A protein has these predicted regions:
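C-terminal output/effector regions of signal-responsive regulators
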Residues: 137-197
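Short hydrophobic/Thr-rich beta-strand motif most characteristic of the beta2 strand and flanking loop
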Residues: 31-40
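A short, hydrophobic beta-strand element within the central beta-sheet of small alpha/beta folds
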Residues: 79-89
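Conserved acidic segment of CheY-like receiver
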Residues: 6-18, 23-27, 56
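Conserved phosphotransfer microenvironments
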Residues: 20, 41-45, 54-73
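Receiver (REC) domain switch/output surface
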Residues: 26, 115-127
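C-terminal output helix
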Residues: 92, 110-119
Length: 197
């Protein structure tokens, strides 16, 4: 038994009005809502900010540079799944589209029976990518915090003639007594050492 798909709020971008109407009819018949329509030349970033669609669907013969730049901006500022239906199967264009944040790049246009699986796949892929991106950011932050703590520990070892373990325990004790995070104390130690240079 197939599960019922949730209603998606969609930004529909299309170069041709008659094709846009056909796509809109198909999507609304599937239970989705078109929250905005645009053409490739419109300021897509602003339209996304104003309408907050769940997903962006672009139907065009070949993505132009401006459209790809808009996709890059959207992917940076307000990430969301982007599905592009196109006739352009050039591998360089595909690479540029994926780098710009396109989640699903579908060549040979739109076939009604494929829409639901394509949208579901694009959303799942987008969510997985966002999870990976968040994990990477968290790992980067943890690594940066460790570097700061190590640097501050080195400063204490040099200035107070502590060994590594004693310096670390001293930092932990001070942070606990001041109700601070260890990394915030490390930043303070580094800043103070910079002032005393």
């Amino acid at each position: 038994m197939a599960k019922e798909a949730r209603q998606l709020n969609i930004l529909l971008v299309d170069e041709l009005p008659e094709r846009s109407l056909a796509m809109e009819k198909l999507l609304t018949n599937l239970g989705h809502k078109i929250v905005a329509r645009a053409s490739a030349g419109d300021d897509l970033s602003e339209i996304v900010s104003r309408n907050l669609p769940d997903i962006i669907i672009i139907d065009m013969d070949s993505p132009d540079r401006d459209t790809l730049e808009h996709m890059q901006t959207i992917s940076s500022d307000r990430p969301r799944p982007i599905v592009m239906f196109t006739n352009d199967d050039d591998s360089e264009t595909i690479r540029k589209a994926v780098r710009a944040g396109v989640t699903a790049y579908v060549v040979d246009g739109l076939q009604p029976q494929r829409v639901v699986p394509i949208l579901e796949t694009a959303i799942a892929r987008f969510n997985e990518f966002q999870n990976i991106r968040q994990e990477l950011e968290s790992t980067r932050n943890t690594l940066e915090e460790r570097k700061l703590v190590e640097r501050a520990k080195g400063i204490l070892m040099k200035q107070s003639d502590y060994d590594e373990e004693t310096a670390y325990k001293a930092m932990q004790k001070i942070a606990m007594n001041r109700n601070m995070k260890l990394v915030d104390l490390a930043r303070s130690i580094i800043a103070a050492a910079e002032l005393l240079k």
